[in-house]
């Protein structure tokens, strides 16, 4: 992929000079990669879309191509820092993966963005090996959640094996030849016994999940976010995310839930009115409290924030200055 020109100036978020972020409107952000060639075809973009996410060539070119270029610059800068540090210490430089965290609410589109970044970053000559792991694989098995009385808290921080996730990212970041992670099935809504995802020394590792930016729970413990070289938070208004969640639920109810093996097969026979009511209840009881209490408070910890409008398009980008 070709390089683009230098970045143009932005404004402090909200016009507040005390904010750690600089905010760029969509048009200004899009100019930052105007000379870069979009390496994906329309058919590839369609394959990357999530349910209800109208991702298209224009959105990729104006929003995510500049982001991939910025990440490419960060990768190069981080590698250079590792080299000079190794020289200073008189040690042999060891290649370590660049780790990116992608966070945001359920239904906000973070999975689509993570998949898209994987494809875009793998097209840069210096980062051909890009791996994507979601934190779903580090959820406690349903049987354990039931034992602890946490099934209705699935997706909340306490429902994850955070130590296992931290060990996994630490091993990858340390350059381990092969690291394994549990596999999660959205059909069975559970960890699949014996199934694994294998990560083998990638150039870039993307970790996507609801609460990946959460700090450690007090004391001096290490959090997985401490291992990120870059982090992205996908932001939108609560009412828009609630609407996207409901529409996604209806799409699944008419499709995937019809599979008798689906954990949610019991919802397949609901009328549209009943399905909407059920989706609204799940949102109000589980997803919105998790967003309010655990997910959105981590937004300020991100290196970059993507702000979405009601149609899923990104309207502005906030980049941390310090």
UniProtKB/Swiss-Prot annotation:
Broad class of the protein's primary localization: cytoplasm
Localisation: Cytoplasm
Enzyme Commission number(s) of this protein: 2.7.1.33
Gene Ontology molecular-function annotations: ATP binding; pantothenate kinase activity
Keywords of the record: ATP-binding, Coenzyme A biosynthesis, Cytoplasm, Kinase, Nucleotide-binding, Transferase
Catalytic activity from the UniProt record: (R)-pantothenate + ATP = (R)-4'-phosphopantothenate + ADP + H(+)
Pathway as given in its UniProt record: Cofactor biosynthesis; coenzyme A biosynthesis; CoA from (R)-pantothenate: step 1/5
An annotated GO cellular component: cytoplasm
Listed GO biological process terms: coenzyme A biosynthetic process
Annotated ATP binding sites: 104-111
Pfam families referenced in this protein's UniProt entry, alphabetically: PRK
Transmembrane domains' residue ranges: none
Family membership: Belongs to the prokaryotic pantothenate kinase family.
UniProt protein name: Pantothenate kinase
Organism from which the protein derives: Leifsonia xyli subsp. xyli (strain CTCB07)
Originating gene: coaA
């Amino acid at each position: 992929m070709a390089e683009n020109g230098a970045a143009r100036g932005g404004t402090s978020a909200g016009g507040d000079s005390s904010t750690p972020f600089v905010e760029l409107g969509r048009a200004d952000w899009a100019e930052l990669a105007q000379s870069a060639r979009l390496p994906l075809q329309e058919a590839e973009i369609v394959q990357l879309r999530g349910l209800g996410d109208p991702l298209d060539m224009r959105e990729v070119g104006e929003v995510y191509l500049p982001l991939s270029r910025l990440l490419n610059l960060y990768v190069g800068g981080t590698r250079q820092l590792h080299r000079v540090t190794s020289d200073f210490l008189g040690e042999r430089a060891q290649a370590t993966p660049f780790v990116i965290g992608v966070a945001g609410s359920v239904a906000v589109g973070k999975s689509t963005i993570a998949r898209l970044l994987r494809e875009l970053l793998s097209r840069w000559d210096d980062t051909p090996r890009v791996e994507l792991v979601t934190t779903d694989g580090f959820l406690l098995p349903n049987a354990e959640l039931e034992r602890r009385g946490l099934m209705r808290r699935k997706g909340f921080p306490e429902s994850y094996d955070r130590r296992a996730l931290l060990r996994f990212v630490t091993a990858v970041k340390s350059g381990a030849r092969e690291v394994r992670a549990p596999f999660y099935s959205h059909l069975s809504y559970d960890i699949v016994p014996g199934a694994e995802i294998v990560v083998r020394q990638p150039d870039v590792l993307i970790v996507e999940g609801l609460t990946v930016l959460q700090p450690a729970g007090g004391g001096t413990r290490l959090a997985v976010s401490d291992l990120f070289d870059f982090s992205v938070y996908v932001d939108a208004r609560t009412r828009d995310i609630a609407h996207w969640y409901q529409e996604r639920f209806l799409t699944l109810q008419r499709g995937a839930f019809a599979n008798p093996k689906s954990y949610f097969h019991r919802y397949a026979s609901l009328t549209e009115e009943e399905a909407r009511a059920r989706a609204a209840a799940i949102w109000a009881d589980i997803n919105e409290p998790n967003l309010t209490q655990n997910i959105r408070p981590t937004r300020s910890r991100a290196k970059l924030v993507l702000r979405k409008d009601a149609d899923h398009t990104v309207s502005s980008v906030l980049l941390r200055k310090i």
